Amino acid sequence: MAKYVTIMDIARELGISKSTVSRALSGDTGNVKAETLQKILATAELMGYHRNELAVNFRQQSTHNIGIIIPEIVTTFYMTFINEAQAILRKQGYKVMIAISNENPEQERENILMMEQLRVDGILMSACDKEHNVDLYNKVIERGIPIVFFDRTVEKVKASQVHMDDYIMSFFMVEALLRKGYKHIIHIPGPAYIRNSYERLRGYRDALEKFHIEYQAQDVLSPALSAEEGSWVMERFLEKNVPFDAVFGFTETAVLGAKSAIQKRGLRIPEDVALCCMSGTALASLVHPQLTVVEQPIEKMAQESCRLLLEHIADGYRRIEEIALRGETVIREST
């Protein structure tokens, strides 16, 4: 096993006090002679000394580490968010630790407790379930670790939250389809345990109501997140031979799966069936036909989430904010 070089080892090598070596290596050099300082620094480098950052941070009550907990990596949204947030936090002197919950509330719970044990200064989090771990969220916050929720937010938690206005953006998307003349729009929702799913479904229903089209429960298919799930759900629906002329999906990956199933049936997009979805990314412009999407303001979401978390780390929860961002509707070939 490798032996870690300690301050005591350097002091013993040079025959000087441990406190002198400690001051020199911590930057407190006011009372250390220049000649002694040079010897200490040279010896430390020669012996392979590395400062124990964990011990230093423990004494300073700060690790300068931020935890980011995400529910999945099926969609490209979270990787884009992490890249943006990490760049922002690094500029402020923070390192980022990432944990994935795999849509499992118990695994999410373990991730939160792990972050707490590692003494992160704060957590950016997208919840995998809107209710399951609310008790733990509140306890961790009460114990002094601020949490800012992004994208998948939760209720009954005294924490700042940043998300897209899912209701209004889904309403606008379905309204755009209806204005184009589509009459029978089916919806591939997200799982019920995600708060965004309810908001997007609500926008879909209210847009239909505005155009005096009766909401039909059978037009809301089984939930899907991945392309595989989207394909499976669409295949099951197509087997029923129910007429429809458009698909509105919870997320891009599920709609790409649905697109594959539709094209395998020989249906043309958009001549026979129009496709659109929420949570669009750059991927939507790389497929043929290109997808009509609502693009989430990921960069802005990361900026606001980081800003709020850094404010909470600096001064506690003086002001809790909920920020609902507008996305951008991008009309492409699929509609």
Locate predicted features:
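N-terminal helix-turn-helix DNA-binding module of bacterial transcription factors
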Residues: 1-63
